[in-house]
Amino acid sequence: MISSAEDLWHQILERLQLLLSRPTFETWIKTATVQSFDGQTLTICTPNPFARNWLQKYYLKTIADVAREIVGKPVEIELAIAQGAEHDTSIRPTSRGEVEATPPAARHRGSELNPKYVFSRYVVGPNNRMAHAACLAVAESPGREFNPLFLCGGVGLGKTHLMQAIGHYRLEIDPNAKIFYVSTEQFTNDLIAAIRKDSMQSFREHYRAVDVMLVDDIQFIEGKEYTQEEFFHTFNTLHEAGKQVVLASDRPPSQIPRLQERLCSRFSMGLIADIQPPDLETRMAILQKKAEYENIRLPREVIEYIAASYTSNIRELEGALIRAVAYISISGLPMTVENIAPVLSPTVRKIETSPEIILKVVSEALNVPISDLKGNSRRREISMARQVGMYLMRQYTGLSLPKIGEEFGGKDHTTVMYSCDKVAELQRTDPEMGSLLRQLSDRINLASRSTEP
């Protein structure tokens, strides 16, 4: 029995706290209050238009579903802005099925920030520690220490996450802050549209009346002379006004072809923070945190397997986790390495490597000289290391069995086949062997990447 609007909202909050991650709940749900409930419509007040728009876009259906479960019938949700917010003098409900026009103060694309891209969900490791610290410093004191801040790194390494985390952090401190997140492609498209409509003045006011400007994929500005010209003046206007500029690219400014020298100079005059691919421990931590936020229980060996299989970027890593979880959910099988391996194997991209790298990795990791790997010693530790090396060489090279035998001192191809089958069987039945192979695979991947031109 629902005694009041406050009682219903309290029950909804209790359930949402279990359904959503803690940062999401505390940032977007806990700050809202209830205004009324007439038996059919529940009106919820948010502290500002930004929060209202966010709930409307991402959590309205979840709230409605929870309310329906509690009340026992469909409940319509209306979102309103609390009295006094954004200098308003009244509560203004947002009509169902219609998103209210964004107020001028919120028209900057801060409202397009991904709610998951916050600092609390970013896993810090040796590969990104400097970039994370720089972004946090910028978020706390924009326009001071590192301006501009230039983030560079490969695809899927977390540049966009860090950029948008800066925006979220500033909006938590000051909901009225004008945060502008935009891709270089969007900047170019807006510029072209402004030229066609003869509205350059409006374009410039739009892009220059911001507190923090976050520009993604700035490398795509290369060769676009007029875009570079306009961006140069936009950058200067913001920088001279003490406004923070954060740029992200897949390469440092000096390596962006056909970039004007003056832009290259300005992009480089702040801090350039490089983000590298995460190491094995960081990848495992990323998977663990992702699983915790999604309320997924993962055995450690599964985390190790996925982390060792996907080494290039975080996007692929999380995609593999999603595929594994989806398969287990649909099939009803237990979450084990054996069950998820067939689902992930077709898309696991092993790096083609050389026999020399594999011999070196196995020798160093197992403390067995390469001469012994190629020799005929039957000592248990040497024989096992040799078999592991043969297995890995079959996995990571295109060599035939006879060719692999030649790499190990002229062994017969039947010996290679026996060794590969034995190690494969041990991988399925012996957790220690599985862990060893994942560690060696990770080392091979890293060693192979370091030798790429």
From Swiss-Prot:
Residues 1-73 are annotated as: Domain I, interacts with DnaA modulators. Oligomerizes as a right-handed, spiral filament on DNA at oriC. Gene3D superfamilies: 1.10.1750.10, 1.10.8.60, 3.30.300.180, P-loop containing nucleotide triphosphate hydrolases (3.40.50.300). SUPFAM superfamilies: P-loop containing nucleoside triphosphate hydrolases (SSF52540), TrpR-like (SSF48295). One of its GO terms (biological process) is regulation of DNA replication. Transmembrane segments: none annotated. SMART domains: AAA, Bac_DnaA_C. It comes from Thermosynechococcus vestitus (strain NIES-2133 / IAM M-273 / BP-1). Pfam families: Bac_DnaA, Bac_DnaA_C, DnaA_N. Residues 73-111 are annotated as: Domain II. Domain I is involved in oligomerization and binding regulators, domain II is flexibile and of varying length in different bacteria, domain III forms the AAA+ region, while domain IV binds dsDNA. Keywords: ATP-binding, Cytoplasm, DNA replication, DNA-binding, Lipid-binding, Nucleotide-binding. Plays an essential role in the initiation and regulation of chromosomal replication. ATP-DnaA binds to the origin of replication (oriC) to initiate formation of the DNA replication initiation complex once per cell cycle. Binds the DnaA box (a 9 base pair repeat at the origin) and separates the double-stranded (ds)DNA. Forms a right-handed helical filament on oriC DNA; dsDNA binds to the exterior of the filament while single-stranded (ss)DNA is stabiized in the filament's interior. Residues 112-328 are annotated as: Domain III, AAA+ region. Signal peptide: none annotated. GO terms for cellular component: cytoplasm; plasma membrane. This is Chromosomal replication initiator protein DnaA. HAMAP family: DnaA_bact. It comes from the Bacteria. PROSITE patterns: DNAA (PS01008). One of its GO terms (molecular function) is lipid binding. Residues 329-453 are annotated as: Domain IV, binds dsDNA. ATP binds at G156, G158, K159, T160. Its main location: cytoplasm. Belongs to the DnaA family. It is found in: Cytoplasm. InterPro entries: AAA+_ATPase (IPR003593), Chromosome_initiator_DnaA (IPR001957), Chromosome_initiator_DnaA-like (IPR020591), Chromosome_initiator_DnaA_CS (IPR018312), DnaA_C (IPR013159), DnaA_dom (IPR013317), DnaA_N_dom (IPR024633), DnaA_N_sf (IPR038454).
